[in-house]
């Protein structure tokens, strides 16, 4: 039996969002002390091939234990974070008006938001005041991504890891409508 999963991701262009003073404790994405939830600790990369020959070749895509998620994903872009679609992680969410978007791919070089390159300084200085860790919801570009994948039946009972090579600035992931993780600056 093949298991079907719907991956939903939201990428925010901010590191943290400003919380109102006096509110109850901030959710993790508003807390500068929280960089990840349900993620493996950062470390050198490795991959467990099923045999020595494949390991010596070192080509992950040749392994039956590897699945690429590259390709077209359903994509929605909003300029202001608070306008991101609510409930888009639900398996029955209608994304028919969304566009197909190439992954890997930066939304800034695919026609969304502003192209930014900074190796020093504050990358979003044209969008809002430089006041880290506080960031406005306005002009806080947010991309929402959805993809349906089929997981091979022989993966049942195995640990499955999602490796995101790069996400700016943070990422939340759901599988079949259930939250599974959060990461910053992956």
Question: What residue ranges belong to the model's regions?
Answer:
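Bacterial Sec-dependent N-terminal signal peptides
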Residues: 1-22
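Short, contiguous pre-domain boundary segments
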Residues: 46-58
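Mature N-terminal segment immediately following signal peptide/propeptide cleavage
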Residues: 61-77, 100
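Disulfide-rich extracellular domains of secreted proteins
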Residues: 69, 90-93, 180
């Amino acid at each position: 039996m093949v298991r079907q999963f719907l991956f939903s991701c939201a990428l925010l262009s901010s590191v943290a969002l400003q919380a109102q003073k006096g509110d109850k404790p901030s959710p993790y994405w508003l807390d500068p002390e929280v960089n990840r939830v349900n993620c493996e600790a950062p470390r050198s990369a490795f991959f467990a091939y099923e045999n020595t020959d494949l390991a010596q070749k070192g080509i992950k895509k040749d392994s039956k234990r590897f699945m690429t998620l590259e390709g077209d994903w359903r994509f929605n872009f909003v300029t202001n974070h608070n306008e991101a679609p609510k409930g888009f992680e639900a398996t029955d969410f209608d994304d028919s008006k969304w566009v197909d978007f190439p992954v890997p791919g930066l939304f800034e070089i695919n026609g969304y938001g502003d192209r930014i390159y900074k190796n020093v300084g504050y990358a979003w200085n044209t969008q809002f005041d430089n006041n880290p860790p506080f960031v406005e919801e306005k002009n806080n570009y947010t991309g929402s991504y959805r993809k349906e994948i089929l997981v091979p039946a022989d993966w049942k009972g195995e640990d499955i890891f999602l490796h995101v090579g790069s996400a700016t600035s943070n990422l939340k992931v759901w599988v079949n409508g259930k939250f599974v993780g959060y990461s910053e600056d992956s």
